[in-house]
């Protein structure tokens, strides 16, 4: 389940110049490939991005923000705050505010102050992540499962937040079906703490399903009209996944940067992160805005599947992760629970095709591993949202030619 398709062969690094000095690293790859190349700075970057690029349209790189939640002068997204305690108790006003947030922004905070036990488990998982990700690479690669839903994935396996550079995060994943099954594909470290991960992920699952239930209620779905819950049957296979990410502290940009712009594949994403770096593409005001971390809050966002199932009513917002300065100056940790519909769920995608939830999942992960140039030709990475909303600056960035950084303005996008 969630295995990488054999068609995912293309890589951004296939376009390396012949004189590129490179390093070899065991990495997430097609089964027929034993290694990948990492670009060295002598080919493309002098040392790091020049300071004058800090105001680049579509690629804000403001001064480094601390890890706490104080306002640091960064351009912040104005997101609604939904109180989980009120929502689960059936507060009508809170349900209406939830519907409005999904309609208008597709992103909102979920206040979890009513769940102290869950917040304690969050700290326990962060402690686990700190220990796991600081193992040697060889040890972590033993958990590589060649899968997009379980196992370990090293840095630099997909395109990053800057043109010509790969991503710079590593991850450890555990699918819901595996956690509740025999666990044969789980990393041994996850199996050792399976009680924690089951309790932690089950609580997130309970909350996102409750959000779907409230949306069904607000829209009057049910009866003869299939509800959102109907596409998340307990007895159906799905690619719902718990993902743990680390964006390592870096000294240079030569190995990659951030997490490329995209919309999420599934129904709802439940995100926990206490550090800056997440940006959402806002409609009003138009442009990239940081999602400020809030203690005791999760960030919930609508995914492509829920947008399609809602008849394109809900907004699946484009987002990315990028350092608040040119480099990631400290390890950044985030946890995401990706709720995904049953594999056999059918919907009409942004191109007008009738596809299954599994097909959309597999195709989109393949596009993640394409080059930036190829991604710009396809609507799937951002779910067609960049064309639907016609927001300026989504493709703006940096082009690196002959070792020199060139600014791309709106006229180049």
UniProtKB/Swiss-Prot annotation:
Domain of life: Eukaryota
Catalytic activity, EC: 1.14.-.-
Keyword entries, A-Z: Iron, Metal-binding, Oxidoreductase
Pathway assigned to this chain's UniProt record: Secondary metabolite biosynthesis; terpenoid biosynthesis
Domain Fe2OG dioxygenase: 235-341
Biotech exploitation of the protein: Viridicatumtoxin and its derivative, viridicatumtoxin B, exhibit anti-methicillin-resistant Staphylococcus aureus (anti-MRSA) activity. Moreover, viridicatumtoxin and a C2 acetyl analog, spirohexaline, have been demonstrated to inhibit bacterial undecaprenyl diphosphate synthase, a potential new target for antibiotic development.
Annotated GO MF terms: metal ion binding; oxidoreductase activity
Short name of any one Pfam family annotated for the protein: DIOX_N
Amino-acid positions noted as binding 2-oxoglutarate in the UniProt annotation, renumbered to this chain: 332
UniProt entry tagged with the keyword Glycosyltransferase: no
GO biological process, alphabetically ordered: terpenoid biosynthetic process; viridicatumtoxin biosynthetic process
Binding positions (Fe cation): 262, 264, 319
InterPro entries named in the record: DIOX_N, IPNS-like_FE2OG_OXY, IPNS-like_sf, Iron_ascorbate_oxido_reductase, Oxoglu/Fe-dep_dioxygenase_dom
Family: Belongs to the iron/ascorbate-dependent oxidoreductase family.
Function: Oxidoreductase; part of the gene cluster that mediates the biosynthesis of viridicatumtoxin, a tetracycline-like fungal meroterpenoid with a unique, fused spirobicyclic ring system. The first step of the pathway is the production of the malonamoyl-CoA starter unit for the polyketide synthase vrtA. The aldolase vrtJ may be involved in the synthesis of the malonamate substrate for malonamoyl-CoA synthetase vrtB. The polyketide synthase vrtA then may utilize the malonamoyl-CoA starter unit, followed by sequential condensation of eight malonyl-CoA units to form the polyketide backbone.
Name of the featured protein: Oxidoreductase vrtI
């Amino acid at each position: 389940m969630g295995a990488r398709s054999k068609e995912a062969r293309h890589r951004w690094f296939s376009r390396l110049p012949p004189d590129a000095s490179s390093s070899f690293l065991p990495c997430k790859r097609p089964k027929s490939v034993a290694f990948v190349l990492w670009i060295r700075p002598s080919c493309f970057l002098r040392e790091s991005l020049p300071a004058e690029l800090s105001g680049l349209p579509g690629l804000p790189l403001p001064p480094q923000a601390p890890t706490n939640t104080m306002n640091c002068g960064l351009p912040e997204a104005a997101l609604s705050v939904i109180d989980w305690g009120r929502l689960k108790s059936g507060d009508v006003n809170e349900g209406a505010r939830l519907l409005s947030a999904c309609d208008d922004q597709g992103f909102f905070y979920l206040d979890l102050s009513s769940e102290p036990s869950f917040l304690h488990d969050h700290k326990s998982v962060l402690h686990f992540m700190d220990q796991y990700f600081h193992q040697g690479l060889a040890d972590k690669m033993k958990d590589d499962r060649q899968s997009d839903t379980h196992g370990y994935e090293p840095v630099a396996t997909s395109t990053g937040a800057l043109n010509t550079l790969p991503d710079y995060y590593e991850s450890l994943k555990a699918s819901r079906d595996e956690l509740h099954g025999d666990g044969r594909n789980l990393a041994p470290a996850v199996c050792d703490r399976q009680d924690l991960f089951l309790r932690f992920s089950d609580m997130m699952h309970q909350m996102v399903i409750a959000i779907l239930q409230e949306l069904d209620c607000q829209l009057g779905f049910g009866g003869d009209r299939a509800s959102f819950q109907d596409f998340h049957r307990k007895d159906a296979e799905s690619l719902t996944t718990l993902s743990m990410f680390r964006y390592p502290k870096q000294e240079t940009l030569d190995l990659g940067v951030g997490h490329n712009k995209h919309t999420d594949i599934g129904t709802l994403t439940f995100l926990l992160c206490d550090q800056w770096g997440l940006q959402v593409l806002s409609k009003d005001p138009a442009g990239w805005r940081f999602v400020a971390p809030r203690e005791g809050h999760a960030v919930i966002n609508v995914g492509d599947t829920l947008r399609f199932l809602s008849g394109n009513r809900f907004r699946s917002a484009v987002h990315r992760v990028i350092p608040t300065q040119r480099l990631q100056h400290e390890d950044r940790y985030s946890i995401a629970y990706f709720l995904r519909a049953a594999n056999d769920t059918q919907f009409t995608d942004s191109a007008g095709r009738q596809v299954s939830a599994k097909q959309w999942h597999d195709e989109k992960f393949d596009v993640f591993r394409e080059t930036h140039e190829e991604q710009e030709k396809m609507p799937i990475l951002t779910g067609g949202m960049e064309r639907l909303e016609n927001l300026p600056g989504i493709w703006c960035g940096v082009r690196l030619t002959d070792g020199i950084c060139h600014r791309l303005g709106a006229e180049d996008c």
